[in-house]
Amino acid sequence: PSNRATLGGMVNTDACGKGSRIYGRTSDHVLELTCVLSNGEVLESVPLEPEALSEYKKKSGISANIFKIVDQVVSEKTNLIQEVFPKMSRFMTGYNLAKVYGNSENNFNLNYLLSGSEGTLAVVSKAKLRLTPLPKHKSLLVVKYETFDDALSDAEMLLKSDPAAIETIDEKILSLAKEDEIYLKIKDFVADEKGKSGRKKRPTRTINLVEFCGSNKNHLEKQVTALCKTIDATNNKSGKATGYYRTVDPQEISNLWSLRKKGVGLLGNTKGERKPLPFVEDTAVPPENLADYIREFRTLLESYGLEYAMFGHVDVGCLHVRPALDLKNPEEESWIRELSDKVVELVKKYDGVMWGEHGRGFRSEYTAEFFGEELHQDLRRIKEAFDPNNRLNPGKIVTPLSHDDKVV
């Protein structure tokens, strides 16, 4: 959550969140990194043109070898890297080989490799970042739906209006919100729509929060108005939105985003022995695959008789999914492994990644599943170049090529 985020943590997980379709990940804003290597050596990382890269390779210590090995891997395996790394804004983190050269400057840039490496390559001691001015104007549209499937299926249409963010909140979160103080502030905005006769239309069970930002107020209003007209054209038809609420009021916008921020906290109030758990929480697939992917994901969870909550960044294909399990029950505890394995296969089927936002951590054993064995060995070569004795966050992402230690 934003009240606990630190820049160091953001760099090390290559963090992103609401608005990442527009603003990208942390690595997209890193200009320079100063890092301490496992032997105490200081490494300065900046984008390098070919001549400068050649000079870096001539340096003494393990830094020179790092530049040689990384350059060799990304140069020799260009085609394989392009084939393996998914083409989406929530790109693969944890040794991002695709961006070492495939960045906006087209220069060798180690920052993309270090960002998201979760402390396994070096300790970041200093970061120089690019700042982006905050938008002057905001407008928020609360689009209402009867079902979660309707909300997901509508995302592709909503994306055509080029919003800064689209966030989905499912029925579970909205239901729990009714027992929280936040509901008093937002209940009118998520209420069931009524027809001209005053009779209720289809109930509002889930919502999409669609935010527009910009410096030109008139352009912003035209964007929102155009989207409202599109929604009106199919208003209340089966499978479509039941209605919407439009606001530019800063306090209303803040209250509605507070509902989204409270999602995890609200889930903590779930009654019973089963509690929502975050072990498959940040999978990501291309947005055009999201509705079909989530449909299968839900079928999988329901086959175990599990309840769950889903919310998050529908615009970039990353939904936070928390199945509710009773960890005091040994059988249900074993389902964490079963479900994780099955979700990995499902994510791969839809050309996605298992870790779209929160880093790899204890899911590192799935690295080879997504990178393939050949690139997995190259990642281990890179780890060996940076940390030959496996001192830095050992067991996470990969282990050095010369070590038999296991990942977690």
Model-derived regions, located:
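C-terminal substrate-recognition/cap domain of FAD-linked oxidoreductases
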Residues: Y101-E105, N111-E338, V344-L346, Y350-V353, ...
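FAD-binding subdomain of flavoenzyme oxidoreductases
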Residues: P1-A155, K160-D162, N389-T399, H403-V408
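Ferredoxin-type iron-sulfur electron-transfer modules and their immediate structural context
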Residues: R274, K349, V353, G361-V408
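Short low-complexity, flexible loop/linker segments enriched in glycine and/or proline
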Residues: M10-T13, E181-Y183, A324-L327, E369-G372, ...
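Intein/HINT protein-splicing elements and their conserved insertion hotspots or analogous self-processing inserts
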Residues: P50-Y95, I182-K196, T206-L209, C213-T234, ...
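Short, conserved loop/turn and helix-capping segments at secondary-structure boundaries
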Residues: Y23-G24, Y145, E333-R337, G372-H376
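Active-site cores enriched in adjacent His and Asp/Glu residues with nearby glycine-rich loops
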Residues: P1-A5, P286, M354-W355
